[in-house]
């Protein structure tokens, strides 16, 4: 248990940041799920819109430090590849 005031404040700050980061991570997962659903449905237009939202949310999480930059880029790259595959299958 923290004894000095600085350590107690650090615990309070960490708790607040953890709550915010958890919400951000959850939001990213929600947008990724929407993209997955659009891909499963096979609707290229909806998937494209969902991809743009998911990419935006992932990069926002990267800029806030919730997700490592390489992880965010890798996920976006894989999502884009899957979207491209869907577009080519539809064409």
Swiss-Prot record:
GO terms for cellular component: cytosol; small ribosomal subunit
Listed Pfam families: Ribosomal_S20p (PF01649)
One GO molecular-function entry: small ribosomal subunit rRNA binding
Signal peptide bounds: none
GO biological process: translation
Record InterPro entries: Ribosomal_bS20, Ribosomal_bS20_sf
Keywords (A to Z) from UniProt: Ribonucleoprotein, Ribosomal protein, RNA-binding, rRNA-binding
Protein's job: Binds directly to 16S ribosomal RNA.
Protein name: Small ribosomal subunit protein bS20
Organism in which the protein naturally occurs: Caulobacter sp. (strain K31)
